[in-house]
Amino acid sequence: MKENNFFNLDFKFFFVTPYLIWLSFIVFYTFNSESIKAGELDGFIKYGNDSSTYLFYAKNLINFDFSNLDIAKLSYITLIAVVMFLKLNLTTVIILQFLTTIISSFCLYLIGKKIFSKWVGLICLSLFLTYLPIQLRNFYLLTEMLFINFSIILTYLVFFKKEKKILILLMTIFVLFLRPQSFLILLSIALSIVLFSKFNKNYNFILKLFIIFFFSFLLLIFTYIGINYYNLTDSLSKGMIWGYSFETNSLCYKECISGLTNPSIYEKNIFGLLLYVKDNFFILTKVSIYKIILYFSGWRPYYSFAHNVFILCFHIPIYFLFCVYFLRLKKFDPFEIFTLFYVLISAIFIGVTFADWSGRYIMYILPFMMLYASKSLFNLLLILKDQLNTKK
């Protein structure tokens, strides 16, 4: 039985099984969403807090009204606008999200297969399709699911299909304007290419310089937007989770962290931000650590005990297996460098901004962590198999 024979009958059965489970979940949820707290569908769609905003901007876009347009989410707004212009049902967007989930899951499998083996790819594929918090996002008229899917597809193309230059360029532009955090994954890809190019002569000097300057420029733009449009100085005072006070276990609108100086007295520029951080360094450092813990754990004080336990029971093994893989590693390939950068930069980003209400930000990096956790799990299964064979 050859390892690389994809069309082996036994493997075909194992490969299809995660998709059958995934499809069963979709059907079950579609017809039973009303029995899940805050999960009821409107037809085939789950509307989030920002859905109405996207619809509003999409209608404006159709009417060539570009005032107050959210550039950071322009790709998703444009997609909705096209669907509305063609007079298609909004369910079309949800169907597209499901289709891209199928494609991205297959790309995860291919990445696992190329780096390790088809069985590692299969384990990663299974983890991705059966992790319900991510898959539930397919039903939401929000940017998250497309961002997760296109991030996976883009990284597959960049690292394993470099010849698809036009497709990579188009997808990079689409991802860049899909979510405000899009620069994190693009920056991670760029850094991994630049760093790996020091050990690989295939990347020329001009390409390396272009990547450095291009993403330095992007970083400056996003820093400017963060300070002026999103008011980062004020954001730092809004708590570990935006607008939630852990001291009172309730919403807060002004001071969510006690002991901070008034952010309104600082100028809205990089110097004002740095001065604010200096004046509140110890409090902000402690809060940043808490934010990162909240980010990785997925635990939220307002979620049910069962929900928090479910999340922790999935996250902790994934993180443990992920760390086991990299602690044993002595030499890094480009995709490993990218993954480490993406995880690290994302954690830092949360530390200096805020953890989100629903825990969805961790979903952006989880598929890549699942990949290396799958390799550790596969190695563990091989050890168990050898021990069982030895006893026989």
Indicate residue ranges for each PLM-predicted region.
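Start-transfer (signal-anchor) and selected internal transmembrane alpha helices
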Residues: M1-I36, K198, Y203-L218, F335
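Transmembrane-helix motifs of polytopic, lipid-linked glycan transferases
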Residues: I95-I115, I153, P317-Y325
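Multi-pass, polyprenyl lipid-linked donor-dependent membrane glycosyltransferases
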Residues: L96-T100, I123-I153, V158, V175-I185, ...
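Membrane-interface anchor segments at the N-terminal boundary of transmembrane helices
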Residues: T91-T92, Y276-I345
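Membrane-interface alpha helices of multi-pass inner-membrane proteins
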Residues: K165-P180, L186-L191, L219
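Loop-to-helix entry region of an early transmembrane alpha helix in multi-pass inner-membrane enzymes
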Residues: L74-T78, L86-F106, R137, A306-C313
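Transmembrane-helix signature of polytopic, membrane-embedded enzymes
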Residues: S105-T130, I148, F338
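Short hydrophobic/aromatic helix or loop-helix immediately within or flanking a transmembrane segment
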Residues: D50-T91, V287-Y295
